[in-house]
A protein has these predicted regions:
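Metallo-beta-lactamase
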Residues: 10-67, 109-125
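A generic "binding-loop/recognition-motif" signal
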Residues: 15, 72, 133
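Active-site metal-binding motif and surrounding structural segment of the metallo-beta-lactamase
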Residues: 1-11
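Well-ordered beta-strand positions
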Residues: 58, 69, 79-81
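Residues that flank catalytic or metal-binding motifs in active/ligand-binding sites
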Residues: 5, 46, 74
């Protein structure tokens, strides 16, 4: 973020509120969620670049986000229109099997939100689980579309 001084910074509004109103959380440490130097930048000189995302947002033509929940309060899905159809990626599903088997990730806040996100992701022809090493097999040379 600091390397791109002209970029807008899009953050889940739900996640932002959760971050600022939760004092103890079993797997979201404040300093690991948003390191102090980044937080200072976000609420300081970069605040005018921060966009707090509603549950459904269109960022630009062909680029949308939706709140997916499941993993944590800041989890979102990003949809990108490509020549091969819509691609969706999210941290609510780590590997493809999470989506295909409707099996929530191991560290989840709400398994029902995960299952809802899986069902919605399955509507897209291209699913990109963020942490799946098989993405390199699915997408030759790392090219999605």
């Amino acid at each position: 973020m600091l390397a791109f001084p002209n970029a807008k910074i899009h953050i889940s509004k739900r996640g932002w509120i959760h971050f600022h109103t939760t004092h103890k959380h079993p797997h979201d440490g404040r300093d690991t969620s948003i390191p102090p130097q980044i937080l200072a930048e976000l609420v300081g000189k970069s605040w005018d670049r921060v966009v707090l995302l509603e549950d459904e947002e269109t960022i630009a033509p062909g680029l949308r986000t939706w709140w997916s929940g499941g993993h944590h309060r800041a989890s979102i899905a990003v949809e990108v229109d490509t020549k091969n159809g819509t691609a969706v990626l999210s941290d609510t599903f780590f590997v493809m099997e999470n989506v295909l088997n409707n099996h929530p990730i191991g560290i989840t806040e709400n398994m029902y939100e995960c299952m809802t996100a899986h069902a919605r992701a399955l509507k897209s022809p291209i699913i990109i689980p963020l942490y799946d090493p098989k993405n390199f097999d699915r997408f030759k040379d790392g090219v999605v579309a």
